Amino acid sequence: MPPAPPPGHQAPPIPPAPPQPAAVHPAPAAPDATGHLRLPAAGPVTAPSAPPARSAPDPTTTTLAVLLIGPAGAGKTSVAKHWAEHRPVPTAHISLDDVREWVRSGFADPQAGWNDDSETQYRLARRTCGFAARNFLANGISCILDDAVFPDRPVIGLGGWKRHVGPGLLPVVLLPGLDVVLERNAERTGNRRLADEEVARIHGRMAGWYGSGLPIIDNSQLDIPTTARLLDEVLARAIASPPSW
């Protein structure tokens, strides 16, 4: 035991405790973003919610994912582009044929015959389209895609689109008469123009969509703006009662 200090002697002051470091709070987790853009969710796109029963669905202001199906010469790319350009809300248009032709060297042209290479490049293009669509939708931008989807060919079927975009994708078939697609095909140039026999064969296979339950628009006698307005009507019904596919 240390000796007591003599009378009148004050003990030395106790030094103050060293300051404690400020508590470090972890920064809030950044959203899944690239710059200020939201990346698509890991899951597929869900079906758009129908508005209350008392109000009619308005496809012109709803964020949608649409797949416009049709044979060569059906006008699906022209209609999809017009529809996207004239909506009052942000809307993107993605044509699978355009994406497939991003491959410059080594492009597997389906006109040269359907083989493993053309199938692989088709699958890749479809997957790329699906990711792009989900990316647009994640940022509040609707998307319309167009592709010649065959009802009798699993690899070129709706299943792949459903996997890559999601069950919220709304498919619509554009199917004018054979004489119309032959006439439109004759106006094409480059590798987008097909032989008449091939156009007729594709058109015949597309007839398999009848009875599928998907909405079908016969635009044989319709111009592009009228077809786009009819597409809005079809989509309004699809939002209210989504087709089973």
Which residues does each predicted region cover?
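Walker A (P-loop) phosphate-binding loop of P-loop NTPases
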Residues: 73
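Glycine-rich phosphate-binding loop used to anchor ATP phosphates in small-molecule kinases
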Residues: 120-165
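A glycine- and Lys/Arg-enriched "phosphate-lid" helix/loop adjacent to the NTP-binding pocket
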Residues: 165-209
